[in-house]
Amino acid sequence: GSEMCIRDSSIVSQLYHDGYMEARSVEQTKVFEAAEQFARIEGILPAPESSHAIRVAIDEAVKCRETGEAKTIVFGLTGTGYFDMVAYEKFYNGEMRDFIPTDAQLAESFASLPQVPGLDN
């Protein structure tokens, strides 16, 4: 994947905290499958970061089709994937692997984060 530094917006974090949005975990290969589908239909190679949102939007649309629910689905396309061709190459060559950390690995990682005064840690 990408070696980019990804930061959370304080506004997005607050919207999540207040229950206006949810976070979802998506396997890397499923993300790139969605990116490929989007590129074939729209003619735009999406950035991997945007492709996570595309995957979830597709999943939501399929769920709505199956349940008959009418819903407006919006996602952000924040960039193209032309700077991340190595990741696309790994996907197409079958070299990309999904990594799903265990609860113990997550707990160990979270325990190593610095404590920030004034935040719920």
What is each PLM-predicted segment?
Residues 1-6:
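Short, small-residue-biased leader/transition segments that mark boundaries at the very start
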Residues 7-10, 81-83:
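Short, acidic Gly/Pro/Ser/Thr-rich loop/turn segments
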Residues 9-66:
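Active-site-adjacent helical/loop segments in soluble small-molecule enzymes
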Residues 58-117:
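Catalytic phosphate/nucleotide-handling subdomain of diverse soluble enzymes
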